[in-house]
Regions:
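Short alpha-helix plus adjacent loop in nuclease-associated cores
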Residues: 3, 9-58, 96-99, 104, ...
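Glycine-rich, often acidic, oxyanion-interacting loops/wings at catalytic, nucleic-acid
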Residues: 62-154
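Short helix-capping/linker segments at secondary-structure and domain boundaries
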Residues: 43-45, 74-78, 136, 174-178, ...
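Residue-level detector of well-ordered alpha-helical segments, enriched
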Residues: 70, 74-77, 165, 181, ...
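Phosphate-backbone recognition surface of nucleic-acid-processing proteins
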Residues: 154-157, 163-246
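Low-complexity, acidic/Ser/Thr- and charged residue-rich accessory regions of DNA metabolism proteins
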Residues: 200-201, 236-276
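Short, amphipathic alpha-helical segments that act as regulatory/interfacial helices
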Residues: 36-39, 61-64, 68-71, 75-83, ...
Length: 276
């Protein structure tokens, strides 16, 4: 409202306005005075202001990510349910290449289960079909965003990124110029380790997880398909996994993918795999 009436509006980042967070006595009047002093000294840490279109795209894509995550959890639940059944049931299920295809679901619904067990499985598959419908509804929107975004098209050339993840990353980053280098992008995604330093000792802890969790989710989600598709990325991951363990290697791979995203976006080009 303020910007439309000719008044410059600044939105302060609540986690970074340390003067307010540390105050012993907090009242609206005191907070306003502190903000006024910070503004006068040009020390207000601002939140990035997204366009209306970007915020709308965020909501749709994040909702889709929620549905995808819920579907993954539901699939795991179905597999766990079937693993608890008697051997002849498990043998019938094992013959199906995809139990969630139309044919596979018919096989599951035809299993010789106890009445209560059958109802449980029917409820799980009904929920699966509902999630599948909701995800399908966003497909046209994802396609439209992809066709309109050169950045998403560059990102899609990177191993591990399909259309949806490419569009999600492009929308969450929005404007690459707000990141001065790859380290700032890593911090924004929350894939850097926490650091505790005292004297001459420095301890690196778990990742901070304080950044954009959707961007972090997309980068981590792309790790496994990326290392399967790209030889050099696989070598990078396996070398780290041997020395630091699988979890740390996975986070390092997510950082590597974000670095590649930064470079192809900034240079306006497709990803080029190293040729031996």
């Amino acid at each position: 409202m303020g910007s439309s009436s000719g008044v410059a509006v600044k939105i302060a980042h609540p986690n970074e306005v340390k003067a307010i967070a540390r105050a012993k006595i907090k009242t609206d009047k005191r907070d306003s005075e502190v903000l006024a002093h910070l503004l006068r000294m040009n020390m207000i840490p601002e939140v990035y202001r997204r366009s209306t279109e970007n915020r709308q795209a965020q909501r749709v894509l994040r909702q889709r990510a929620f549905y995808v995550s819920a579907m993954t959890a539901l699939k795991n639940r179905v597999h766990a349910f079937l693993a608890q059944q008697r051997e002849e049931i498990r043998e019938v299920v094992a013959r199906e290449t995809n139990i969630f295809s139309e044919k596979g679901q018919k096989v599951l619904l035809g299993l010789d289960l106890a009445p209560r067990e059958k109802k449980l499985l029917e409820a799980l598959l009904k929920t699966y079909r509902h999630l599948e419908t909701r995800i399908g509804e966003s497909k046209a929107f994802v396609e439209k965003l992809y066709e309109e975004s050169r950045e998403a098209q560059f990102i899609r050339t990177i191993p591990g990124f399909g259309k949806y993840l490419s569009v999600l990353v492009a929308v969450e980053i929005a404007d690459l110029t707000r990141f001065t280098d790859t380290a700032h992008l890593h911090a924004y995604a929350g894939v850097i380790p926490s650091i505790h330093s005292s004297g001459d000792r420095t301890h690196y802890g778990k990742i901070i997880k304080a950044g954009n969790r959707w961007l972090r989710w997309a980068a981590v989600e792309a790790v496994w398909p990326a290392i399967r598709a790209d030889f050099d990325l696989r070598c990078f991951y396996e070398r780290l996994a041997r020395g630091k363990g699988a979890n740390k290697a996975k986070v390092a791979m997510a950082r590597r993918l974000l670095t590649i995203i930064y470079k192809v976006w900034k240079e306006g080009r497709n990803y080029i795999a190293y040729r031996r």
